[in-house]
Amino acid sequence: MRLMLNEPVKEIMTKDVVTVTPDTPVSKALGIMEENGFHHLIVVDKKDGKEEYYLISMRDLLLASSTDEEVRSLMYKAHCVHEDTPFLDAVCEMLDSGQRAAPIVNNVGKMVGIITDYDIMARAAKSKIMKDTKVTKIMTRNVITINENDSIGKARALMRDNNIGRLVVVDDEGNPVGMVTEVDILKKVFKPKKKMTAGEFKGEKVPRMGQPVRLIMNTPLITVDVDASAADAARVMQEYDIRGVPVVKGKSLRGIVTRLDIIKYIADLKKGAMIEIELHGMLDPEFKDLAERIIATEVKKMVKHAGKIHWIKITIKKERDKGGVPYYRITTYVKTPNKLYVGEGRPKASLPNKLEAEGEDIAYVSEHERWEFIDVLKESLESVLRQLEADYDKYHPKHAGKVVKGQFPEEFNPEEFKKEE
């Protein structure tokens, strides 16, 4: 079982790619999307014996002026990803390009597959990292909602004003009862309305955009519990082919997580921006700034040797000896994809003896306590760093004593480490 999300994207991609050509009518492209549950299609344009790849989205097709229009007027040049690109890098490339899908190409630029946000959800659902990540960590907490009796027009305005593609629909008690998306409005309201010569459907006294949103919302509402993992949320979105899922506790709405949230989180893992550091125990305010700087410095050193760190937990115990003089015991836990490292820091000498020998006053006690804490903290962190360096040299004999910045060399085999299933 791979833990590092570093397999080549060709192992994740969908190999059987459905494509269209630039002269395909919008109506036919929409039919292909609805039949297969696609949100995007690749357009293959052959020029001078070579293929160029473009993308079209369902949203763009639904906004077309005519269903007889050719897709060439709506397609855009696709950013392609090489088949040997590591999965994490491929996710970053997709995110940077603004695409939710990307053609996968070989060494000669020939398309061999496609990766979509659906494929990313499938991989995330199996990821040990994502299983260890609470959905509450990546969800949006301040959810924009709409009452089930509010108009469809209001729902559209809320989406436009907040630059979002979906709204959770709530009842009068504020409990979530459904979901409405921009595509729902386009498919169920906008497109049918465009076919009419008047602004209302025959026999209706209220225009469609003025009707209650409950008429077009998706129900029953699919949710995940507040205790679920990010992997659980990814699995639900993949299984039900939805792009966002509310997070609930009982009947209470606590947040919402989308495919984009998970994609961004995965990209942040690659960029090293998601190392969670937890401090347990009493950290005196006068130590805080210096302690944080020391932790940040040592963590950077750890990342160079570990490649990836899931989380760091530091426990601080402040105790007193028989003479009432405070001292610290600090333990640092560092979780990598393959191992849990533990480092301990303890006072190196008896503080009372030092004070008695020096004969200093209480101000000295306070200052000495500060540096005693810092010394113990550094010893705890450096203990873990020494273990990481030892493992790095053990599995990188060619690079003993050196650091390869960014990631492990190719000869590193994560299977040699003890796995934590």
UniProtKB/Swiss-Prot annotation:
- Please give the superkingdom of this protein's source: Archaea
User: One Pfam family name from the record?
Assistant: CBS
- Residue intervals of the CBS domain: 13-74, 74-133, 139-195, 217-274
UniProt-listed PROSITE patterns: CBS
Alphabetized, the UniProt keywords read: CBS domain, Repeat
Keyword Repeat part of the UniProt annotation: yes
PANTHER family, A to Z: CBS DOMAIN-CONTAINING PROTEIN, CBS DOMAIN-CONTAINING PROTEIN CBSX3, MITOCHONDRIAL
The molecule here is called Uncharacterized protein MJ1404
Q: What organism, scientifically named, is this protein from?
A: Methanocaldococcus jannaschii (strain ATCC 43067 / DSM 2661 / JAL-1 / JCM 10045 / NBRC 100440) (Methanococcus jannaschii)
